[in-house]
Each structure stands twice: as C-alpha cells, then as structure tokens.
Amino acid sequence: MIYLDHAATTPVPEEVAHAVYDTLVSGWGNPSSQYPIGKQARDAVAAARETIAAALGCKSEQLVFTSCGSESDNWAVRLALHQNRHAGKHIITTAVEHSAILETCKALEQEGYSVTYLKPDKNGDITASQVESALRDDTALVTMMLVNNETGCIFPVAEVAQLLKAKKSRALLHTDAVQAAGHLPIDIKAQNIDLLSLSAHKFHGPKGTCVPVSYTHLTLPTKLE
C-alpha cells in the first residue's frame, strides 16, 4: 500500500521506535526517585524537553506532555480563559476548527461565555480582518488553528498576533498547530503566540504524546483536579 494520508497520522521511523523501546526496557524508572534508574528517566525527560523547546522557540519548563491533541486543546483553552478571566467572557474561533476546540467552545457557551465563530470563504480561508471585526473589549481568547486538518488552508495566526498587539487587546492567542508541525516554521516567541498545541503522531512521533505550550505570562497548573 502507498500511504499518503499523513494528515491523519504518520508512520514511526525505526530510530524513534528504537528510542521508545530502549526507554521502556532500560529507562523505566520513576523520574521522581533518587536512585540511578530514576535519575536516568529524569535526565531523558529533561533532554526531550530541551530538544522540543529549542525547536519551538520556548523554554523547556513551558512544555506540558498530555495524552492526545484533544486534551491539549481543551487544556490550553480552559487555562487561557481561567488565567485571563478578568479580560472578559468572549471567545473568537473559526467554524472549521478541530472538534476538540468546537466542542469545548459549545461547553463554554453553556457556562456563560459568548463565542464568535468565523466562517471561511469559498476557498476555505480565514482572514485577520475577520478577527479584527469580531474583536471586542471583553474578548479574552482567540483560538485559531494554524493549518486546517481537512482543507490544508493556512490560517493567518502570526498576522492575528500582530493585530492583537497593535490593538492592545487583552485577548490571549491559542493555536492548534497539530497539522503544521514539520511543515511550517513555528517560533512561539517570535510569532507572539500565547499557547500552542501539538500532537507527536502527526510528525512521526509515538501516539499518546502531545504538547500544549504556554509561552508568555501564563502559569502552568501544579496539580490535577
């Protein structure tokens, strides 16, 4: 079979599979423990963090590993709204986001949030001017994917970031970059992105490993509810 559907998932290269296997066999210690096998696991996690952070233009402590892209999206949106709760209860997103974003927004509407869903044009594109028109004084979050998972359209996330900065908006910017990783350059600091979600299996990594990234002033949670 000739496999071309890398937007759905990607094969794991042998070197990645070997790295996972080696970790399962010889690096299985509890990273919180103080004996050698624990230190080995702790060092491996730290090295992985540094590698990913260098690729994304952020600090290693701003990375959180989750189980899937949907969890990353849910977590990022709710974190942004919680920490930016004094800005207001308005969200801007697109009508063609991944269901993890759309379903979260629907749930948030039931919790009292107002959500503006931007519709794409006939070519599937969304423009920064649409975001500008929808922007309100009480907008707390703009969440927009970087690349659409069905059409392949690239959304103007960097332009939206510049817009929010120029308007001195209090809104935070989250982007689901799951389909963009490995295809488009990503630099969280340079592109003024507050939160970003990735999923390893979309760019030849193992399934069940995803990363929501918090860049600017957001404080990552220290406990699970």
Briefly describe each language-model feature range.
Residues 1-218:
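Pyridoxal 5′-phosphate
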Residues 217-225:
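Single conserved hydrophobic/aromatic residue that forms the stacking wall/gate
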